[in-house]
């Protein structure tokens, strides 16, 4: 994981503005601390926002950042990146806005195909995230996707990145388990 953080820091030029989504993979390997400690980036960290309004401003800055960092719920053997999202902030930033998007993805998220990737996202990542955020959905109760339409559903947006505009998206595959 240390090598992944070093590679990430090499990929981001000094003076760049950087933010990230609510990724456990990003947190698992202490990327926010590495960026802050490097002292050469303009870092927007919503976790350090003093209140909800300030956090919302950081969400919006993601669209004009030089670099947006994310993980994925799954990546297929042929490179399709799959994400689900409740509010859309992550998939929106991955799709539009930031000049560059770097994915940091653990090998535990590698799946054979898109169907397996979506199943992984909905049946493994979503129930764990609903528990993490204490969201009251059926999958939180039993760990099984019910394809719910609850007001608290975190699977409102399903995003497949199958081809990237030249140079916008980059992937760092980490040879260990990261996130869920």
Per-region residue spans from a language model:
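N-terminal active-site beta-alpha-beta segment that forms phosphate/nucleotide-binding
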Residues: 1-59, 64-69
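Conserved phosphate- and dinucleotide-binding cores of soluble alpha/beta proteins
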Residues: 62-180
């Amino acid at each position: 994981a240390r090598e992944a953080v070093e590679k990430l820091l090499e990929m981001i030029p000094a003076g760049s503005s950087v933010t990230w989504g609510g990724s456990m993979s990003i947190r698992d390997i202490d990327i926010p601390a590495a960026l802050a400690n490097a002292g050469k980036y303009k870092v927007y960290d919503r976790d350090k926002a003093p209140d909800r309004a300030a956090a919302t401003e950081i969400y919006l800055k993601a669209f004009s950042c030089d670099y947006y960092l994310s993980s994925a719920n799954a990546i297929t053997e042929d490179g399709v990146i799959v994400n689900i999202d409740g509010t859309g902030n992550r998939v929106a930033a991955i799709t539009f806005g930031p000049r560059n998007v770097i994915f940091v993805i653990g090998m535990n998220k590698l799946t054979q195909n898109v169907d397996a990737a979506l199943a992984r996202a909905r049946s493994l990542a979503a129930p764990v995230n609903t528990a993490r955020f204490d969201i009251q959905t059926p999958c939180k109760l039993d760990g099984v996707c019910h394809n719910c339409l609850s007001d608290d559903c975190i699977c409102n947006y399903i995003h497949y990145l199958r081809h990237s505009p030249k140079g916008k998206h980059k992937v760092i595959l980490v040879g260990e388990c990261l996130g869920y």
